[in-house]
């Protein structure tokens, strides 16, 4: 299939412009581990998020990273491991479409991407390589068992699209030009995977491709201003493994769905009832 994107074309066997790309048949996710990528100072929200997750998946393991924030070691037990690491998020907040090519910002982006891969590897190892993983944050509430379309290796709601602005479009043409140089990859034009729920072995395959082709993929940071945010970076890793993000109707977001409290969605993003005013990155 040839996809026409203005002055560019992309060849693939699916239409990446379509948001709802799933099948009707689903399977339950039972074997899953949780990786909290950055909990910073969201103490109450983190505790509530973990409590909710354990209510649904009591046997699942959790790898918890505090990137320069509070010490959560008091939460450790046989199913939860805590790691205090460097804050790689606050510097990214200051990067935008005007300054992302500055050498110092390039270094920040690359450092953040490397940290995400390291945390994924550490988390999967602690969780004993479950069939599925969930990379998440404290503003995510898992309030029910999650299922996946039979063909899916990565779940999300694909809410973001590359043609949102011309600069985004140009950036994703650059990203996909890099991906096209590597055998077995697919294009990426839609994404929005928060939390990231994916198939562990497929992720590891994508990481392997990324590391083997790092001379090419190190240039991702030069194409777009935020390629390292994990809702985009992980779909890129799955694209390297030949797998698209597949739309899940089990996701909802509090800021987009005023009826989220009474809806049946098991995965809730932007859940901030336990946040306080000093819970955010930046100068706090």
Say what each PLM segment does.
Residues 1-48:
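N-proximal low-complexity "stem/linker" segments adjacent to membrane-targeting elements
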Residues 130-141:
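Short beta-strand-to-loop acidic/aromatic patch adjacent to the donor-nucleotide binding site
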């Amino acid at each position: 299939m040839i996809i026409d994107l203005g002055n560019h074309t992309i060849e693939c066997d699916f239409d990446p412009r379509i948001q709802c790309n799933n099948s009707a048949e689903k399977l339950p996710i039972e074997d899953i581990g949780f990786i909290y990528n950055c909990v910073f100072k969201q103490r109450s929200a983190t505790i509530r998020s973990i409590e909710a997750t354990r209510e649904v998946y009591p046997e699942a393991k959790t790898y918890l990273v505090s990137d320069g924030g509070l010490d959560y070691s008091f939460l450790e037990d046989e199913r939860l491991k805590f790691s205090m690491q460097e804050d790689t998020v606050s510097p990214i907040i200051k990067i935008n479409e005007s300054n992302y090519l500055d050498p110092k910002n390039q270094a920040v982006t690359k450092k953040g991407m490397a940290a995400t891969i390291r945390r994924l590897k550490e988390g999967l190892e602690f969780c004993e390589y479950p069939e599925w993983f969930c990379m998440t944050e404290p503003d995510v509430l898992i309030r029910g068992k999650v299922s996946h379309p039979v063909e899916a290796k990565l779940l999300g709601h694909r809410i973001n699209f590359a043609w949102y602005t011309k600069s985004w479009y140009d950036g994703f043409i650059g990203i996909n030009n890099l991906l096209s140089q590597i055998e077995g990859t697919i294009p990426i034009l839609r994404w929005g995977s928060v939390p990231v729920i994916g198939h562990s072995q497929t992720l590891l395959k994508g990481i392997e491709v990324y590391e083997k082709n790092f001379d090419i993929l190190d240039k991702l940071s030069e194409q777009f201003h935020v390629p390292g945010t994990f809702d985009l970076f992980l779909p890129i890793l799955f694209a390297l493994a030949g797998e698209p993000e597949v739309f899940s109707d089990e996701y909802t977001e509090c800021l987009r769905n005023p009826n989220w409290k009474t809806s049946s969605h098991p995965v809730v993003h932007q859940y901030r009832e336990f946040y306080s005013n000093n819970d955010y990155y930046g100068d706090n």
